[in-house]
């Protein structure tokens, strides 16, 4: 979840400006970059509870501790709520899940080092505060009521609005963690092709990375409960975006979609004005009830773009949003998977060949089925595991052709070894944890905090 943007306060007088924001993301291939984001759950080592914001063991104390590594604090109402350094940021999700939004980097080698460096810094400070951090898709032990709330104006508005539009939106906010990657496009046509491929294959990523099988200490019947949660959060701003596959799709059609997504807020002069459920189209006419007469700025539009949560999201780049969070190796594998598919022309063509004849019903069956069944979901006489094997194969070939090597001469394809192992075994991370729960853990989720912490 993004923090308020800092785009120019240019007033919006014409819909064309909104289209130009998306078009301004176009970059030649040599300028394509990789932006990886991941979230993680904090817990107190003594009782495994999530830390509150305040206090000697609190999230603010952790953020303050991280400033020793050169991070610059960002404050809201006098409280440190985020950190900035060299194009990267550390921010807070609603219940204090700690998010690293990485800088725009050139290779997976760089993004994996960036993630590892961050995890090391967090571990050092967290250890002093007797905190730990866990990478999974859903909080395995604590109830919604057990989760603290961070003091951010945006989240206060969303917290009151979510229960009006879905049963599980508050769980999405407080009890989920994801890993995602942001990738570039060269032209509108390139964006469309990448958008279609990544939407169709997003359920494959959900299956491969499935790691949220527990709710409140018990198996919940899902392998990616985090993915299921998005199906009952807010239908106006989530889903598989069928219109992306329609003839004529492009920037204009996506702008129309965003204009139909109800607003959450307008951020003016350091204040979040609650505009939940109101229309950005009305805002453009100066008819926003909460700010009568005011016209939106490009900052308002940039903020509004972050309040849509489809499986793949377009801003000035494409965001892959389907995967559960996990350990360091999978935080490197997720961007590698998508870079291999989308940043090599032959791989992108092969991926499109794989999915181009999927029907709308099939795309929805994949999206709706993988949260529960993951790789074992039946599909066209085989299973999702077969699709995943092919997608991983295409991605590995794409990374080999990309041939971005580290100092030891290795290309980026090695980052997919962890996915190859999941495909070969047919076992998702969630299924491995369920086996431990029913075996060595003796029906307790508590060992997950020791055995799978960063």
Where are these regions (language model features)?
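Beta-strand elements of well-folded, non-transmembrane domains
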Residues: 42-44, 104, 187, 324-326, ...
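Charged, low-complexity interaction regions
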Residues: 403-409
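Loop-rich catalytic cores of soluble enzymes, especially ATP-dependent carboxylate-amine ligases
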Residues: 127-128, 132-313
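Structured core elements
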Residues: 41, 180-184, 319-321
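Long, well-ordered mid-to-C-terminal structural blocks that present hydrophobic/aromatic surfaces
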Residues: 278-362
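Terminal catalytic/cofactor-binding subdomain
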Residues: 1-167, 175, 210, 330, ...
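Conserved aromatic-histidine-acidic binding/catalytic patches
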Residues: 28, 107-110, 114, 182-186, ...
């Amino acid at each position: 979840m993004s923090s308020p943007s800092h785009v120019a306060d240019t007033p919006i007088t014409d819909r064309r400006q909104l289209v130009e924001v998306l078009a301004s993301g176009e970059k030649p291939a040599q300028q394509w970059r990789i932006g990886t984001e991941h979230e993680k759950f904090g817990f107190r080592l003594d009782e495994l509870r999530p830390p509150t914001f305040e206090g000697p063991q609190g999230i603010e104390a952790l953020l303050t501790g991280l400033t020793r590594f050169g991070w610059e604090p960002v404050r809201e109402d006098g409280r440190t709520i985020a950190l900035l350094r060299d194009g990267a940021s550390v921010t807070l999700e609603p219940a204090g899940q700690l998010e690293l939004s990485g800088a725009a980097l050139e290779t997976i080698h760089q993004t994996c080092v960036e993630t590892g460096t961050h995890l090391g810094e967090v571990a050092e400070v967290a250890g002093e505060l007797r905190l730990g951090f866990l990478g999974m898709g859903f909080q395995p032990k604590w109830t919604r009521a057990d989760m603290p709330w961070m003091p951010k104006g945006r989240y206060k508005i969303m917290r009151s609005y979510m229960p009006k539009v879905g049963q599980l939106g508050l769980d999405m906010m407080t009890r989920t963690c994801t890993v995602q990657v942001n990738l570039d496009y060269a032209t509108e046509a390139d964006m469309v092709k990448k958008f279609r491929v990544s939407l169709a294959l997003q359920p494959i990523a959900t299956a491969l990375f499935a790691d949220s099988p527990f709710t409140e200490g018990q198996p919940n019947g899902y392998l990616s409960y985090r993915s299921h949660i998005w199906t009952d959060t807010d239908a106006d701003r989530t889903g598989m975006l069928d219109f992306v596959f329609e003839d004529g799709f492009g920037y204009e059609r996506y702008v129309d979609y965003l204009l139909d997504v109800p607003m959450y807020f307008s951020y003016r002069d350091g204040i979040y004005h609650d505009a939940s459920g109101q229309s950005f189209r009305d805002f453009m006419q100066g008819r926003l009830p909460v700010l009568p007469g005011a016209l939106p700025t490009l900052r308002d539009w940039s903020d509004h773009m972050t309040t849509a949560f489809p499986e793949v999201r377009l801003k000035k780049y494409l965001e892959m949003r389907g995967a559960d969070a996990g350990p360091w190796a999978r935080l490197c594998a997720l961007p590698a998977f998508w870079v291999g598919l989308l940043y090599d022309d032959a791989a992108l063509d092969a991926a499109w060949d794989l999915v181009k004849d999927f029907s709308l019903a099939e795309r929805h069956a994949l999206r709706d089925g993988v949260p529960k069944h993951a790789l074992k979901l039946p599909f066209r006489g085989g299973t999702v595991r077969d699709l995943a094997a092919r997608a991983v194969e295409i991605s590995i070939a794409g990374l080999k052709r990309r041939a971005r090597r580290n100092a030891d001469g290795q290309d980026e394809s090695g980052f997919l070894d962890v996915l190859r192992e999941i495909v070969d075994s047919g076992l998702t991370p969630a299924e491995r944890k369920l086996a431990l729960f029913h075996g060595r853990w003796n029906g307790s989720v508590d060992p997950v905090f020791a055995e799978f912490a960063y």
